[in-house]
Amino acid sequence: MSTDLRTRVLSEHHVSRETAASLDLYVAQLTRWQTVKNLVGPATLKEVWHRHIADALQLLSIAPEATRWLDLGSGAGIPGLILALAGKERPGFHVRLVESNARKCAFLSETARLTGAPVTVHNARIEAVIGTLTDTEIVCARALAPLSQLLAWTEPLLTSGTTGLFPKGRDAATELTEAEDEWTFTRDLIPSRTDSQARIVRVTSLSRVDP
């Protein structure tokens, strides 16, 4: 890990000393569990502060007032657990993590316990719990599914006032075009701060296209 990169990420996102310590513990946990659970792409661990920490933290700058977050397919806690660590000093900040893989949920639960992250871990399929989480302000998902599928899963939320923030790569425009065949929605394409070819798709006011 580059110490300079860590320092730059913490400075750019105005991370407190306490939060930095929590993020360091998260990175240590991720590194330890990676040896047996393969939580992230092995090559990305060398750039964990850029590829994972900074990539997650940028979502907070898009919705700085939101306190009720939901992360679908949370996996290694990216972005949800990282967001929880960054927001845990704020009153009422809470992130719900939905993950169907029990081994990954074990990592999430153990790391949340060690770091004091304000999260609830749901070991369940998205379809089984999404209807019970409609008080969510922001729903996010990274590297989980095409946008059209994400909209199908989150329809109960995005039709009820929730905002979707979905990090996407260079195919963001193509995924948007495909999604617009099935859905009507208000959207913005926000440039990623960690990858010049990536975009964060912000979605509100979702409805199905009339047949």
UniProtKB/Swiss-Prot annotation:
GO MF annotations in UniProt? rRNA (guanine-N7-)-methyltransferase activity
| Enzyme Commission number, as recorded | 2.1.1.170
Q: Which SUPFAM superfamilies match?
A: S-adenosyl-L-methionine-dependent methyltransferases (SSF53335)
Matching entries from InterPro entries are given as:
rRNA_ssu_MeTfrase_G, SAM-dependent_MTases_sf
* Entries under Pfam families matching the protein: GidB
Q: What is its main location?
A: cytoplasm
Where is the protein situated, by its record's location annotation?
A: Cytoplasm
What name has this protein been given in UniProt? Ribosomal RNA small subunit methyltransferase G
Q: State the organism named in the record.
A: Methylorubrum extorquens (strain CM4 / NCIMB 13688) (Methylobacterium extorquens)
